[in-house]
Swiss-Prot record:
This is Large ribosomal subunit protein uL3. GO terms for cellular component: cytosolic large ribosomal subunit. Transmembrane segments: none annotated. Belongs to the universal ribosomal protein uL3 family. Gene3D superfamilies: 3.30.160.810, Translation factors (2.40.30.10). It comes from Chlamydia felis (strain Fe/C-56). One of its GO terms (biological process) is translation. One of the primary rRNA binding proteins, it binds directly near the 3'-end of the 23S rRNA, where it nucleates assembly of the 50S subunit. Part of the 50S ribosomal subunit. Forms a cluster with proteins L14 and L19. One of its GO terms (molecular function) is rRNA binding. Keywords: Ribonucleoprotein, Ribosomal protein, RNA-binding, rRNA-binding. PANTHER family: 50S RIBOSOMAL PROTEIN L3 (PTHR11229), LARGE RIBOSOMAL SUBUNIT PROTEIN UL3C (PTHR11229:SF16).
Length: 221
């Protein structure tokens, strides 16, 4: 079952470490507290097999919890009999994996102990509304005196035929804040004691954002 799991962690930032060959490598640091099974879905009642995982438990008194969490979410956790978490993630698994799972089971970094590379998903940094030069790398117009065309997109249509602009062209719009997956990132180090995972290179999102880590779909056999 462990090979099918995706676990949630928190991006802490980036550091440099030396690899086994003495090369300086830029790494992303992901802290990963245990993910807890908060709900089990089976094909007979839900139409598919899945496990819902919860991370980042909300540890506050019951009276405070009633104020911070809305009733539908509280009812969901009460029905499953699990603790209350800030983040939930559903993972599709096989029927055998569902039969093995039990409410309250915890999964941590030990899931990736035998893994050399992982896929990481997260929400990229939001850049707000941006023009075509920043978002798509357009060259822009002349930088000289007299030019009224510096950072514009330029022509986006043709002539009287077709007499319209085709949809999907590159235009100024919101940049960032989208789901991004980076595949086959090398695992540099797993620290089970500190619950920290180091992967080579950058990962999506700002510091403190939630990322989802899974075994790489492109890993060599």
């Amino acid at each position: 079952m462990r090979s099918q799991l995706s676990l949630m962690g928190k991006k802490e930032g980036m550091i440099h470490v030396f690899d086994k060959d003495g090369n300086l490598v830029a790494c992303s640091v992901i802290s990963m507290s245990p993910n807890v099974v908060s709900q089990i879905k089976v094909d007979s009642t839900d139409g598919y097999n899945a496990i819902q995982m919860g991370a980042d438990e909300i540890s506050v008194p019951e009276k405070t919890l009633q104020k911070r969490v809305n009733k539908p979410i509280l009812g969901h956790f009460k029905k499953s009999g699990s603790r209350v978490f800030r983040t939930l993630k559903e993972v599709r698994v096989s029927e055998d994996a569902v039969n093995e799972a039990s409410l309250g089971s915890e999964f941590g970094l030990e899931v990736f102990e035998d893994v050399s590379s992982v896929d990481i998903s997260g929400v990229s940094k939001g850049k707000g509304f941006q023009g075509v030069m920043k978002k798509f790398g357009f060259r822009g117009g002349p930088k000289t005196h007299g030019s009224g065309f510096h950072r514009h997109a330029g022509s986006i249509g043709m002539r009287s035929t077709p007499g319209r602009c085709f949809p999907g062209s590159k235009r100024p719009s919101h940049m960032g804040a989208v789901n991004v997956t980076i595949k086959n990132l090398e695992v540099i180090k797993i620290d089970l004691e500190k619950k920290v995972l180091l992967v080579k290179g950058a990962i999506p999102g700002p510091r403190g954002s939630v990322v989802v880590v899974r075994r790489s779909s492109r890993a060599k056999a």
